[in-house]
Amino acid sequence: MTSRRTAGALLAVGVLAGCAPSTHSAVITGEPPTPVTTTTRVPRLVDESDRPLVAFDPCLDIPDDVLTAAGYDPRTEDNADFAATHFTMLGCSYDGTLHIPGVLANYGLSVLSANFDFEEERQKATGNGDDIVPTQLAGRRALLKTNSSLPYSCGMSVETSYGVLIFGRIHFRDSSAPLPKLQWCVGLEDTVGRIVAVLDDFESTSR
């Protein structure tokens, strides 16, 4: 429980640091703000801006078997939603199942789906002082992110049709031995790739 909450908290700090202050208010989705078709799912939270709705919900749309195959326990799911007047993030965090004695106690993973665009995410990450490596994943623009002020953590932001999917992972050490920065992100791209494959299927059937 501690690792999951810590992972979610640290990711939220990193994501929200580059965003303007807000009232943290949300529109109640019991009354949809705009008419929707019978095939459109209204997000659990919506904001008051004219941004796109957050279509992909990590808490609802990532199958348990995908999380398990990636090395995370779906039973440890913990909500990490955030709604402001001007943007929305839907997400959850999970405890990892991989344990390497003397090296890795476990991983903590957070997945947030947001409706600010890729360039806003890039600017936010730069403003946070992140070390950014632009890359691509499954044909999508992506950013690999580390930050010396958040040791043993690694992030990846992937462009979506409505905004970005933001991943944050923390390596909880199983000893006091330091972990070289070059190893902070080992294996994260594989995890992200598995979930982005789910996103690909979701977006292809939602058009």
Could you say what each language-model-derived stretch is?
Residues 1-9:
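Bacterial N-terminal signal peptides that target proteins for export
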Residues 23-207:
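A small/polar (G/S/T-enriched), proline-flanked helix-loop surface module common
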Residues 15-18:
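C-terminal motif of bacterial Sec signal peptides marking the signal peptidase cleavage site
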